[in-house]
């Protein structure tokens, strides 16, 4: 059954939280900057982003994530938001902390890679009906799940308990990261997440609320509403 999108998403500046600014989150932020420009061109009031991440850029992040050599040593959320604000004339915010315990965002996008971080996001309080998008990946596969907090769509972490329960994944080092995780899986997952955000603004209803994708097998399966 199709999900009817809330009509007020086109009536005012939409607040979007991004939790995690690394592999997937850095690509999501850059895509949101392009989306903001497109929405303004179409007459939409626009979006305002608050990005959360306590981590700093390491040399290992350059290339896989949307960072450069000059960014090494700087906080991930700050360096990305500063760049976007400069190039796109935005006033977005960077918070050098983990996701908050409560949020007034209209849309929250989780781009974290640990069960503990997801658990905190799952326990947080959001606006009734706020859209929550979970992004995650393994070596060459991943998922993007769109849900709602106290809304018509299921809350992603109630429906998918494996995202917040179980053992933490091992952290790859700089030598084996390219063997343990496909170079383009993060940007692929980010692209799917951005498509859902764009659809919330540009469509009146959704038939699909998520995807499971596998690069090695060339398969993407939809999660239908």
Give the role of each language-model region:
Residues 39-44, 204-206:
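Phosphate-handling active-site elements
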Residues 32, 43-44, 52, 112, ...:
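N-terminal Rossmann-like NAD(P) cofactor-binding subdomain of oxidoreductases
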Residues 2-24, 28, 104, 115-118, ...:
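Glycine-rich phosphate/adenylate-binding loop
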Residues 45-88:
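Glycine-rich phosphate-binding loop and adjoining beta1-alpha1-beta2 segment
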Residues 109-110, 133:
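N-terminal Rossmann-like NAD(P) cofactor-binding module of classical short-chain dehydrogenase/reductase
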Residues 48, 91-93, 131:
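Conserved beta-strand segments of alpha/beta enzyme cores
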Residues 12-42, 50-58:
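Glycine-rich adenosine-cofactor-binding loop
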Residues 72-105, 112-117:
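A structured beta-alpha segment of the ubiquitous adenosine-cofactor-binding alpha/beta core
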